[in-house]
UniProtKB/Swiss-Prot annotation:
This is Uncharacterized protein YcxB. Its main location: membrane. The chain crosses the membrane at residues 31-51, 68-88. It is a multi-pass membrane protein. It comes from Bacillus subtilis (strain 168).
Amino acid sequence: MIQYASESINLPGEITFKDVREIFFYQIAKISCFYFLLFCAIFAAVNFINGWPRIVYGSDALNLFMNSMLIIVMSVLFTLLLLLLLYVKFSRAYKKNERMKSKRTYTLNQEGIRICSKKYDLIFNWDEITAVFEYKNIFRVNTSSGQYIAIPKHFFHSEEEMNRFKEIILKNTETKKLKFKKDQH
């Protein structure tokens, strides 16, 4: 049931592996480009220091092209391997974390965002909120402690409730980093 207090909203539900995985992929997409460029720089530096291997004889331009392609392919492979290792670590951490999988209720009011469960009760005041992002199926609320609050859209019972959530966020936060779907292109 939707429960409306004067200026609050309650969102009960359980966070699934699919919800957390979506946040993981949004975060990993940003850092994967960095790792790819880092591996390219490392492989280029190694090739430059050790000398370029002679893959094609007779054409320096073709040899340089082939070495560049080798660097790109190796960088892609190492980046994918690193991302796979991070994903395995992430999925194991989720499976072991009972707190993450437990049923919870998010309450947004004038105080801040309260997360209640059988095992814990957390309150994040509005001044702790540094950014809010809306993705396809989830909201990510960043906090000043470097953590984030993931609120899946399936916790909302209607579009009206989701709009009230956005209004409460806009009214109570001073952060300029609010990116709701209408703002994203």
